[in-house]
């Protein structure tokens, strides 16, 4: 219970007790651990051992945490040098010493479906976010290009060819699903699936004009792209010589084979018209050529290496695939035989059944495995480089599924180095925010998006900056890849817009984080029906749900963002605590551990730290090792402290009641004296043993007031004290101060209104005029999550 100060406190027994505590706090401050004990001792070697080497870990679980903390300040951990040290701490290892991936020649490429959301979602889910997503844009400041042959990382030196083959299958699967563009030439790519509205203006559209030339309608503008005006001739009936001469002219013309998008019209544009491809069908012939030949013949700029004769082209094609030669000869025969009257085209297929404004490669009957239906040609407002910007390799899909492969895309050049970009920030809830927004006592359902990043379309010009290759073909990401720092921001915008509409339309509490949706409602039966309606609503818009990770029915206990959440509390799974205790037990006292290994260990401790009675200052010695990149050695007492933290497990309440207690205790300090004042009129003045910085003297008095009176809140005129950021203080004093002041609120009061300002200057306290405010920053919560 709070013990109010009395007027005669300075004459009582408790004054001597308070002075004793003050001297202990001053000793903690004066033993400057940060400069003497934790600075990098570069002269230390492996023979330096901690005093508690070999002692078994038997922490006294019943001992107060404060006793364990004080023991850790006596038996200190040590920093070492940069010599090689242990890279393994239990099951943890240094980030660069992680277990290497094992190549699996039986890796299967996972099923990847076409994720094409309907643009009607812009009207169904009104949000300003869509202007950033339809399409998304990616403009790096500068780009480093790599050769196509370096497209697959040499992750598995013994299985290079097999690795590249599986990567090629994976990329082809992504291309078939409409996620990648495939390069045809410098100005032309092809893709599959349904085109977006902004792609329609770049699709290749060919139209026949009366004089026989071909025009390409690009960017909504039709223009004649002939390089040389053909000599017009008068049509004569039964002109057999013209037909015969046409074959010779075609074979000798340097632009004999014309692409689907003809930028430079040749002398014999009727041939060009017959080679045009529309809607997955062939116009003018039944024969086709493969995608590799298309890269040579579909270039619309006339810059293809076609200076050789038609016969040489035919021979070159025949060496690669035997059916290419048959295509060329048959197409020529169709050109010469299929002309019944000059100036007209005779199609061997019904062109009325072909959809408009569509181009695809023609396919031969003998090459049915290479047939590409539902393919489109696109010439964007950019050039498509025959180089790459990212590299690829394969790993296991996860630790539980080693039969399927996962494609890892390395676009790290855009996040570090000379090409580093500053990606936009977005709201992400921390643990404190999550506690305050989750509704209490409601059943919950979790939904998970399937292939979430592949829902986000990119502008074609941006796609050309995200080039990858399997060593054979060059692909460009048509949808957002996972290896770019912009993708999480885009996904946040995407799911936030959907979550807002779901909450409004279905009257259900909705929270989204990346690809996870959390739905809550007081009525479990109603929530169950809502979840089915939400899934149907999303699927109608082309948004895919991963039902394997979706909660089938409302539950009270759910795992979300790594936390176990029930109706009233949040906690950490017991299995995680057991793993962490096992790691701590395997710490060898006095052994030197590499800082990368310590870095991983600190990451695990940080995740569970809010669920313990500890604070971040307890990890400061390990942070010092990480910052200075030196080895770290655990002491026996420090290992016991870490183990003690994992034993005092607690659960955090959802929607904690926020109370604003009235301040009854105030503190103040000068370089030589400190004072504590109570609202009842009692006060006490203390003399410091030495002059220190004023912010340290202020913190000493606040800690003393907490030890002696145990108030719910304290007034102080020091912003340093009120912000509770004590990283610059000596480690053991900062750790104790953080431990003492974390449970209570500190209010800032201006010095002229501070009731303890008078006693510290030998004047009576004044509680009549009191103005104070908390300096803690209010937690930001989105407006749509505030009203529940």
Swiss-Prot record:
Residues 656-788 are annotated as: RnaseH domain (RH). GO terms for molecular function: DNA binding; DNA-directed DNA polymerase activity; metal ion binding; RNA-directed DNA polymerase activity; RNA-DNA hybrid ribonuclease activity. Residues 288-299 have a biased composition (Low complexity). Residues 201-365 are annotated as: Spacer. Mg(2+) binds at residues 448, 515-516. Pfam families: DNA_pol_viral_C, DNA_pol_viral_N, RVT_1. Residues 358-368 have a biased composition (Basic and acidic residues). PROSITE patterns: RT_POL. It comes from the Viruses. InterPro entries: DNA/RNA_pol_sf, DNApol_viral_C, DNApol_viral_N, Hepadnavirus_pol/RT, Rev_trsase/Diguanyl_cyclase, RT_dom. Residues 1-200 are annotated as: Terminal protein domain (TP). Multifunctional enzyme that converts the viral RNA genome into dsDNA in viral cytoplasmic capsids. This enzyme displays a DNA polymerase activity that can copy either DNA or RNA templates, and a ribonuclease H (RNase H) activity that cleaves the RNA strand of RNA-DNA heteroduplexes in a partially processive 3'- to 5'-endonucleasic mode. Neo-synthesized pregenomic RNA (pgRNA) are encapsidated together with the P protein, and reverse-transcribed inside the nucleocapsid. Terminal protein domain (TP) is hepadnavirus-specific. Spacer domain is highly variable and separates the TP and RT domains. Polymerase/reverse-transcriptase domain (RT) and ribonuclease H domain (RH) are similar to retrovirus reverse transcriptase/RNase H. This is Protein P. The gene is P.
């Amino acid at each position: 219970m709070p013990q109010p100060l009395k007027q005669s406190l300075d004459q009582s027994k408790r004054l001597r007790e308070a002075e004793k505590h003050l001297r202990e706090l001053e000793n903690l401050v004066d033993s400057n651990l940060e400069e003497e004990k934790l600075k990098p001792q570069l002269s230390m070697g492996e023979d330096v051992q901690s005093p508690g080497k070999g002692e078994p870990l038997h922490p006294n679980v019943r001992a107060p945490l404060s006793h364990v903390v004080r023991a850790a300040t006596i038996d200190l951990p040590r920093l070492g040098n940069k010599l090689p040290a242990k890279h393994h701490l239990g099951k943890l290892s240094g980030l660069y010493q992680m277990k290497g991936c094992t190549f699996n020649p039986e890796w299967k490429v996972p099923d990847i479906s076409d994720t094409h959301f309907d643009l009607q979602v812009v009207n169904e889910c009104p949000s300003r976010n869509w202007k950033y997503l339809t399409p998304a844009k990616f403009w790096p400041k500068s780009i480093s290009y790599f050769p196509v042959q370096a497209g697959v990382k040499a992750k598995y030196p013994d299985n290079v060819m097999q690795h590249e083959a599986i990567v090629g299958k994976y990329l082809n699967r992504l291309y078939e699903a409409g996620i990648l563009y495939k390069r045809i030439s410098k100005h032309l790519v092809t893709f599959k699936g349904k085109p977006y509205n902004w792609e329609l203006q770049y699709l290749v559209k060919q139209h026949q004009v009366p004089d026989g030339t071909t025009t390409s309608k690009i960017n909504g503008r039709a223009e004649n792209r002939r390089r040389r005006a053909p000599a017009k001739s008068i049509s004569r009936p039964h002109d057999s010589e013209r037909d015969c001469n046409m074959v010779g002219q075609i074979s000798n013309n340097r632009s004999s084979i014309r692409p689907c998008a003809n930028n430079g019209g040749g002398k014999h544009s009727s041939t060009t018209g017959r080679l045009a491809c529309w809607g997955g069908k062939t116009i003018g012939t039944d024969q086709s050529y493969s995608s590799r030949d298309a890269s040579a013949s579909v270039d619309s700029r006339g810059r293809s290496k076609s200076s050789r004769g038609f016969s040489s082209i035919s021979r070159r094609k025949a060496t690669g695939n035997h059916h290419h030669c048959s295509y060329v000869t048959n197409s020529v025969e169709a050109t010469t035989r299929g002309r019944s009257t000059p100036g007209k085209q005779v199609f061997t297929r019904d062109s009325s059944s072909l959809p408009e404004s569509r181009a695809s490669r023609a396919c031969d009957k003998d090459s049915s495995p290479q047939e590409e239906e539902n393919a489109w040609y696109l010439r964007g407002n950019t050039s498509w480089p025959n180089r790459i910007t990212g590299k690829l390799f394969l790993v296991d899909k996860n630790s539980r599924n080693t039969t399927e492969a996962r494609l890892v895309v390395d676009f790290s050049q855009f996040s570090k180095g000379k090409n580093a970009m500053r990606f936009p920030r977005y709201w992400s809830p921390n643990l404190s925010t999550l506690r305050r927004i989750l509704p209490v006592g409601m059943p919950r359902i979790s939904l998970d998006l399937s292939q979430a990043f592949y829902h986000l379309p990119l502008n074609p010009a941006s796609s050309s900056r995200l080039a990858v290759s399997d060593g054979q073909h060059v692909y460009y990401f048509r949808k957002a890849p996972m290896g770019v720092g912009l993708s999480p921001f885009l996904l946040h915008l995407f799911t936030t817009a959907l979550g807002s509409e779901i909450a409004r339309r279905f009257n259900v509490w909705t929270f989204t984080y990346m690809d996870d949706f959390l739905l809550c409602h007081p009525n479990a039966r109603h929530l169950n029906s809502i979840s089915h309606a939400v899934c149907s609503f999303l699927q109608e818009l082309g948004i895919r749900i991963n039902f394997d990770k979706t909660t089938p029915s409302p539950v009270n206990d759910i795992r979300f963002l790594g936390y176990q959440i029930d109706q009233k509390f949040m906690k950490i799974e017991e299995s995680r605590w057991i793993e962490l205790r096992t790691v701590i037990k395997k710490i060898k006292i006095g052994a030197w551990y590499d800082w990368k290994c310590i870095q991983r260990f600190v990451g695990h401790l940080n995740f569970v730290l809010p669920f313990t009675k500890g604070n971040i200052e307890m990890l400061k010695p390990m942070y010092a090792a990480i910052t200075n990149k030196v080895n770290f050695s655990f002491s026996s007492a420090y290992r016991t402290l870490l183990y003690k933290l994992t034993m005092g497990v607690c659960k955090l309440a959802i929607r904690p009641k926020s109370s604003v207690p009235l301040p009854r205790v105030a503190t103040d300090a000068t370089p030589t004296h400190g004072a504590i004042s109570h609202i009842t009129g009692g006060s006490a003045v203390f003399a410091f043993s030495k002059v220190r910085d004023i912010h340290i003297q202020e913190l000493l008095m606040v800690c003393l007031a907490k030890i002696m009176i145990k108030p719910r809140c304290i007034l102080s005129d020091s912003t340093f004290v009120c912000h509770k950021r004590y990283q610059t203080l000596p480690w053991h004093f900062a750790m104790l101060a953080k431990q003492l002041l974390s449970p209570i609120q500190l209010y800032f009061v201006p010095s002229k209104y501070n009731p303890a300002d008078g006693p510290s200057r030998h004047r009576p306290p004044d509680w009549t005029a009191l103005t104070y405010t908390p300096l803690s920053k209010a937690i930001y919560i989105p407006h749509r999550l505030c009203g529940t």
